[in-house]
A protein has these predicted regions:
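Short extracytoplasmic
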Residues: 50-83
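A cross-kingdom signal targeting lumenal/periplasmic-facing segments of multi-pass membrane
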Residues: 81-228, 232-233
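Alpha-helical transmembrane signal-anchor/signal-peptide segments
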Residues: 37-55
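Short beta-strand-initiation
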Residues: 46, 77-79, 148
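Hydrophobic membrane-insertion alpha-helices, especially the h-region
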Residues: 17-33
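Active-site-proximal structural scaffolding
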Residues: 21-25, 51, 193, 218
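Twin-arginine (Tat) signal peptide motif
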Residues: 12-16
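N-terminal Lys/Arg-rich, disordered targeting/topogenic segments
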Residues: 1-11
Length: 235
């Protein structure tokens, strides 16, 4: 009986500790959001409508527009969708950059949710299967963070294969983990009054299982795009 009582006592203390931690977290969030982050900052930036469509040997025939409902669902403030072509490669590379001026839920939530949607969650819903998924160091010139990481995926739909790179580029950071994105949004909201950020994604076809050429095409185009991004995605 003594052992049972002792076990119940320990379980009770553990429950109290968890409750206190939860309450402390709620209080800290309330204080942070309502006192330290009362006046959000929105850095100056250029609109993606001004982004150059010719980058050396790479060219894009024109920016692609998404329908308004999709834009609302994604919560993007501004975006760029472009299919870059180069005569040296037998396909185009899809480049998407979605900029969110704020990632704070608007009053009432719902359609006011502005946080960045992880591509790994959306791809299966559009019919693509993720057959390889890894986190890699993204050592490409033009990035603000030389220690940044990206998600590298191989996706498939029927016989089609694609190489996908994506990462979150927000307030000078380059990160791939969803939980880090959430943590830094809260931290920067409190300390810098900023929650702006972007999702950057490159999608490259893989033909005849030639993943090496797809990788080379990505490494060829990416530095040219990234060198121009600071004007559109502020550090």
């Amino acid at each position: 009986m003594a052992e049972i009582v002792a076990g119940e006592d320990r379980a009770g203390r553990s429950g109290v500790i968890k409750t206190l931690v939860a309450v402390a977290f709620i209080v800290a969030n309330f204080y942070t959001y309502h006192f330290l982050a009362s006046t959000p900052k929105y850095p100056d930036r250029q609109q993606f409508s001004e982004f150059p469509l010719h980058l050396d040997e790479w060219s894009c025939p024109g920016l692609v527009s998404m329908d308004e409902q999709t834009r609302i669902n994604l919560g993007v403030t501004d975006y760029m969708i472009c299919r870059f072509a180069n005569a040296a490669y037998p396909y185009t590379i899809d480049v998407y950059v979605g900029y969110h001026a704020s990632q704070v839920r608007e009053e009432g939530g719902g359609a006011g949710e502005n946080s960045i949607h992880p591509p790994a969650h959306c791809l299966p819903g559009s019919g693509w299967d993720i057959i390889a998924n890894s986190t890699v160091r993204i050592d490409i010139p033009g990035l603000p963070d030389p220690q940044g990481t990206a998600k590298r995926m191989i996706i498939a739909k029927g016989k089609a294969r694609r190489l996908v790179y994506y990462w979150y580029q927000s307030r000078g950071r380059v990160i791939s983990e969803d939980w880090k994105k959430i943590v830094y949004v809260g931290l920067d909201r409190a300390l810098r009054q900023r929650t702006d950020g972007s999702l950057i994604r490159f999608t490259i076809p893989i033909e005849r299982n030639d993943e090496q050429t797809s990788e080379r095409a990505f490494r060829d185009l990416a530095p040219r795009v990234l060198a121009l991004l600071p004007a559109y995605v502020p550090d």
